[in-house]
Swiss-Prot record:
Disulfide bonds: none
Sites of N6-carboxylysine modification: K224
Pathway noted in the entry: Nitrogen metabolism; urea degradation; CO(2) and NH(3) from urea (urease route): step 1/1
Native source species: Mycobacterium sp. (strain KMS)
Protein name in the entry: Urease subunit alpha
Recorded catalytic activity of this chain's protein: urea + 2 H2O + H(+) = hydrogencarbonate + 2 NH4(+)
Length: 573
């Protein structure tokens, strides 16, 4: 019997069970725990495409028609990195959804072929061999200031945005809000042709229940409470009361100046109800200096925005300039400068690193163009994981690989925001039945630039060479829009998430969109315990004078990183 070395097998079919993969140039290593597409027990029957290879007529390709159930697309031999595990498999896609994760091929001549992965003449092949597959990222904090952010989002592996805004209006530049039914309708129409799923947030800063209900009927899938509109205890209570009745999520940016409430007053107004706390550390806004303590509470779903991820020697200086612009402050006014400086605290930014690593802060978003970079959600997440491994070593249960840490961090921009916003029945993980919103990465470029972004089963964005070249690979290889980004295809492969009330009120008949409208699931029961791998609730204390942070009684010392991976090695600027 002829055998193959691991090196030879990986070169032919990609790595298999027991093989380890380094993520970009970080210190993070993942290990494949199961191979459903080949390896031991299935070796020799791997489904691979190409000249002289397996997936040919009457070999790996069967006679099965689409009517017989053949998938539209099979991704072969990809290493799936998701919150539920790290395995290798073939992935089948049909009608824009994942139909199977297992072994693809022709059951007439091959063993172990999954019944929903029978390759036929109608099946396209995407080679995932040697590549990593993740669920499309969900950016849970996006300001809709300019349409060009959609391109940056796709280029960073994002396939869903939780967003608000109307363009470069002052309200949108500062707050994640699309206010009122008219603006909601126009923005749903404007976003129809982009290959991204969209969740729009209405304005929750009001004590008028009807003002919120009309926004829900107009297409809002949740609300945003922002201090620049007045996040008073009365507005918090009124907004959550409507949200409870409607089944939608509320996202909050609390009162930095503590004019209307302190953190204790805000928590009292929330009354134990589910709420998504944006930029929980506080540099992006929120009760100074102790908003970070809300991450201790079982009903609060905490997230970070990416400029503070991870804490580096440049973080503080950059934030002061960002803050002055984003909140229309005047550096010559002492009160404005004091406002800015009260929000930028190295001790809480440093503590944010640790809270992510132990799973106490559950999500990471961008705060796009309003103190955040939409193209760096995935990148900043893995930089944080790298910094924490260097400082803290392996997590419990990790040893020769960092599977537990990798699963925790990938969850922060996939399944956790999906659960928080009632989207997890449709997106957020690589699981059967969900939309095929998937990202393929070359391991050397993992988290930096995707090899391909698959939106609803169609390649929407990819690394592509010169279009006038004789083959696809000549330089310059750049992230470029693909056919899945064409307007009609984007509408066919993407969805607008709206409130159930919008569906019931016939919103689809009132607006000019081609994509499907899907109601968010009731997420009012969701608390920290429902955040996969990110459900820790340590005791967090902040000294009001020194801003020293204690986590379960221990002071976390500031050690800002002076050097990061996934940086100058990949980017000129």
């Amino acid at each position: 019997m002829t055998g193959l070395s691991r090196e030879r097998y990986a070169a032919l079919y990609g790595p298999t069970t027991g093989d380890r993969i380094r993520l970009a140039d970080t210190d993070l290593v993942i290990e494949i725990t199961e191979d459903r597409s080949g390896g031991t027990g299935l070796a020799g029957d791997e489904a691979v495409f190409g000249g002289g290879k397996v997936l040919r007529e009457s070999m790996g390709q069967s006679r099965a028609t689409r009517a017989d159930g053949a998938p539209d697309t099979v991704i072969t031999g990809a290493v799936i990195l998701d919150h539920w595990g790290i395995i290798k498999a073939d992935i089948g896609i049909r009608d824009g959804r994942i139909v199977a994760i297992g072994k693809a091929g022709n059951p007439d001549i091959m063993d172990g072929v999954h019944p929903d992965l029978v390759v036929g003449p109608s099946t396209e092949i995407i080679a995932g061999n040697g590549r990593i597959l993740t669920a499309g990222a969900i950016d849970c904090h996006v300001h809709l200031i300019c349409p060009q952010i959609m391109e940056e989002a796709l280029g960073g592996g994002i396939t869903t945005i939780v967003a608000g805004g109307t363009g470069p209006a002052e309200g949108s530049k500062a707050t994640t809000v699309t206010p009122g039914a008219w603006h909601l309708a126009r923005m749903l129409e404007a976003l129809d042709t982009w290959p991204l799923n969209v969740v729009l947030l209405g304005k929750g800063n009001t004590v008028s229940a009807e003002a919120m209900w009309e926004q829900l009927r107009g297409g809002a899938a949740g609300f945003k409470l922002h201090e620049d509109w007045g996040t008073t205890p009365a507005a918090i209570d009124a907004c959550l009361t409507v949200a409870d009745a409607a089944g939608v999520q509320v996202n909050i940016h609390t009162d930095t100046l503590n004019e209307m409430a302190f953190v204790e007053d805000t928590l009292a107004a929330i009354k134990g109800r589910s709420i998504h706390a944006y930029h929980t550390e506080g540099a992006g806004g929120g009760h100074a200096p102790d908003i970070i303590t809300v991450a201790s509470h079982p009903n609060v779903l905490p997230s970070s925005t990416n400029p503070t991820r991870p804490h580096t020697v440049n973080t503080l200086d950059e934030h002061l300039d960002m803050l002055m612009v984003c909140h229309h402050l005047n550096p010559s006014v002492p009160e404005d400068l004091a406002f800015a400086e009260s929000r930028i605290r190295p001790s809480t930014i440093a503590a944010e690193d640790l809270l992510h690593d132990i799973g106490a802060i559950s999500m990471i978003g961008s705060d796009a163009q309003a103190m955040g970079r939409i193209g760096e959600v995935v990148l900043r997440t893995w930089q944080t994981a790298h910094v924490m491994k260097r400082r803290r070593g392996a997590l419990e249960g990790d040893g020769r690989a960092d599977n537990n840490r990798a699963r925790r961090y990938v969850a922060k921009y996939t399944i956790c925001p999906a659960v928080a916003h009632g989207l997890d029945g449709e997106i957020g993980s690589v699981e059967v039945g969900k939309l095929a919103d998937l990202v393929l990465w070359e391991p050397a470029f993992f988290g930096v630039r995707p090899h391909a972004v698959i939106k609803g089963g169609m390649i929407a964005w990819a690394a592509m060479g010169d279009a006038n070249a004789s083959i696809p690979t000549p330089q310059p290889v750049l992230p470029r829009p693909m056919f899945g980004a064409a307007p009609a295809a984007a509408a066919a492969t993407s969805v607008h998430f709206v409130s159930p009330q919008a569906i019931e009120d016939g919103l689809a008949d009132r607006i000019d969109v081609r994509r499907s409208l899907i109601a968010v699931a009731d997420c009012r029961h969701v608390g920290k315990a429902q955040m996969p791998l990110n459900d820790a609730m340590p005791r967090i204390e902040v000294d009001p004078d020194t801003f020293t942070v204690r986590i379960d009684g221990d002071v976390w010392q500031e050690q800002p990183a002076a050097e990061l991976p996934m940086a100058q090695r990949y980017f000129l600027f």
